[in-house]
């Protein structure tokens, strides 16, 4: 899974644009991009998306809100439906994850991607325990709130951010956890965005967030080279389906975690 596209969950036009885009994962957002007064409306829109037959071939992983909306309300409503995972914002420690996953049925928890978004000093310092204590397979980095946490401009202090990114990637990959890189809010300078994507991949990131559909082709072109040949893809698909029927939602292949989003992505490659 190479590109994760954020879209405000309270604005139908942006949701439709995301669904019709070539994002490998769509992230309807309930956090920063949605005013508090619109969050319940956004939650209703996410539930309607997950109920819709038109998104059956799409991977939908909402980012929930942990500062305004009731966590149990969001998680209980979303997990009643067919969903692929959740992104948890501003995860500072292992308890931040447990405060969310305690509302997810264990059998479902084993089949979905719970993705902590690390965007603070505490989150970086507690990264290994966050991954290990919660069996996390995919984890995300956010530079903008991290910059606020460090009292720096994350764009101006790019060398420091790159240093932290390298530590983030190393700690993640050493624990067989897939790292996703931060979004870039400058959507006008495409050449700069491409350069950032190339650097990101060279650091070891496996995917990147997008905030606009125009960023997707660049992300997909740079990150979306499959490391598996056709025979391996068929093997992975068959093994995932067999294990899934037995109630197992992930397995390890060539030092990589195969979960539902990876399975759906490889299924799309094999079918294309």
Sequence positions of predicted segments:
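Expand to "…catalyze enediolate/carbanion chemistry for C-C bond making/breaking, isomerization
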Residues: 1-272
């Amino acid at each position: 899974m190479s590109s994760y596209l954020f879209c405000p969950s309270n604005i139908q036009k942006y949701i439709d644009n995301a669904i019709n885009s070539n994002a490998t994962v769509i992230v309807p957002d309930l956090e920063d991009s949605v005013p508090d007064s619109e969050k319940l409306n956004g939650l209703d829109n996410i539930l309607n998306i997950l109920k819709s037959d038109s998104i059956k071939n799409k991977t939908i992983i909402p980012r929930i809100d942990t500062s305004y909306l009731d966590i149990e309300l969001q998680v209980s409503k979303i997990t009643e439906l067919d969903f692929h995972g959740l992104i948890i914002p501003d995860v500072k420690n292992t308890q931040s994850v447990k405060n969310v996953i305690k509302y997810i049925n264990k059998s479902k928890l084993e089949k979905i991607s719970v993705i902590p978004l690390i965007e603070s000093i505490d989150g970086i310092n507690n990264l290994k325990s966050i991954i290990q204590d919660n069996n996390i397979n995919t984890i995300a980095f956010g530079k903008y709130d991290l910059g606020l946490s460090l009292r720096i401009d994350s764009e101006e202090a790019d060398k420091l951010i790159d240093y932290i990114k390298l530590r983030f990637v190393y700690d993640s990959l050493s624990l067989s956890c897939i790292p996703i890189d931060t979004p870039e809010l400058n959507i006008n300078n495409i050449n700069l965005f491409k350069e950032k994507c190339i650097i990101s991949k060279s650091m070891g990131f496996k995917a990147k967030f997008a905030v606009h559909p125009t960023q997707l082709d660049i992300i997909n072109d740079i990150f979306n080279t499959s490391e598996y040949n056709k025979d391996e893809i068929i093997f992975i698909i068959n093994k995932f389906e067999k294990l899934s029927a037995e109630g197992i939602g992930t397995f390890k292949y060539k030092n990589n975690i195969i979960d539902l989003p990876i399975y759906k992505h490889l299924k799309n490659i094999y079918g294309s």
